């Protein structure tokens, strides 16, 4: 094997003496195991100290270099509530400049949030690079003669030929309880104008997903407060449930209602906005504040105006924040809104890095892009604290095409999907859940016994109604049984309509399901169904508070409680019909 030919270039204001040259030669032979020729170049700017370059290694013994080393040493101090002054004194007293080399490279090209760098032979994938302008980048492309990196700041100050340094670190984000109630960017920096956030540590944005032994089955419900979902497609803590649908079909509304429903339940919520309008995110934050939900929520925002690099790392940063709380034994709900824009940002970066395009111009590893993200959501074993992270990824479809590339990828990764249909949405059926295409694969085990007993054959009844509705379009002559079934199905569909920002408690869902599936509401006109539903809940909550409390606390529905609900429902129905008759008589 041929020995690598090296040359050392020494730069300083004054020429080295013969004794100094001998010391440099001895140092280089010890460091590289061979004789390294030394060439001196004058640099008037280096009045105090010197710089020596050997291949890609830089020994920076200038005043600027030593000050930078000292600053980095101070930045490593982590007082965690302890006075930093004694630590600084000790650091100053014990500090010695490091004689180890830095691996430096130079910028070849820069533009479109991408920089190519030569000379960094040992740079690792995902490593953070420091540019001389102060901008940081992350290595995303490794070639024999250069590396490609994405930039986390403006590229205007970066010039071709400028110096780039390795940091030896991967991208990370500060974490801590202080992030609750705050809005941060993809790097964990506050953007809500409320000052700095005290951090309790630093976690890498990319980390391995928990293994099989580290997990336990999904066995606790993550209630959304939405009757259509909790009854037929229940979500468990630690599950990944996709929310899919066209533009303006209520995808974000479902996720936000789920966040609002966690109030008082000890769940930490993280909302990751990817490529959204800043005005929409600001309105969302105001809504959460108004409802008192920001106290337990963190918003990570990489808006449409942010670079593709920040949009790419945003969901990983949000997941790292979630993992901090999950490892402390907390339950976490994380919403990714939305992963379609995340995939587009990654496609943009990949094409700029000159990677080979595949289907729909996405790179070949776009499946891994989302699988490594969503696999980090889990219900941890009791040995690891028993915490959980539930993921609600949102994906936008085009003209209801569920078979497109990104939707099918994420369907195969997640534990179920809630598919929203435009025709249902615009007909007033909101949430516009398509009962036939939606499914929850593991949440059924987490559903409370009360909900399971109350929901009964709801999904089957709705499927029969939808099928019958199609056939009745071709026939006007219907028998009485068919008419009754159609009226019953229409009543169920009307019952599942729910206004935004009004999640139901568990006992309210149980009451409505028990009454509806026993045909108590069969005679209520559709136009008055909303009024009947609201007043029925108020009536039963007033008449039997102990019943409601019992269902909420135990998650059980005894036969006696079921009969009580039916008895009170029929009592109220009689009263409701009497009032309606009196009004019509007037």
Regions found by a protein language model. Give the residues of each.
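Elongated, mostly alpha-helical coiled-coil "stalk/stator" tethers of large membrane protein machines
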Residues: 1-82, 123
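Phosphate-interacting basic helix/loop segments used at nucleotide- and nucleic-acid interfaces
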Residues: 32-36, 86-95, 225-229, 318, ...
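Short, charged, intrinsically disordered terminal tails
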Residues: 66-91, 574-586
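N-terminal accessory targeting/assembly segments
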Residues: 80-182, 187-191
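P-loop NTPase nucleotide-binding/switch module
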Residues: 162-164, 171, 175-178, 191-239, ...
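Conserved P-loop NTPase nucleotide-binding/switch module
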Residues: 247-274, 278-280, 290-292, 308-419
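Conserved catalytic/coupling modules of large nucleotide/cofactor-utilizing molecular machines
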Residues: 341, 351-586
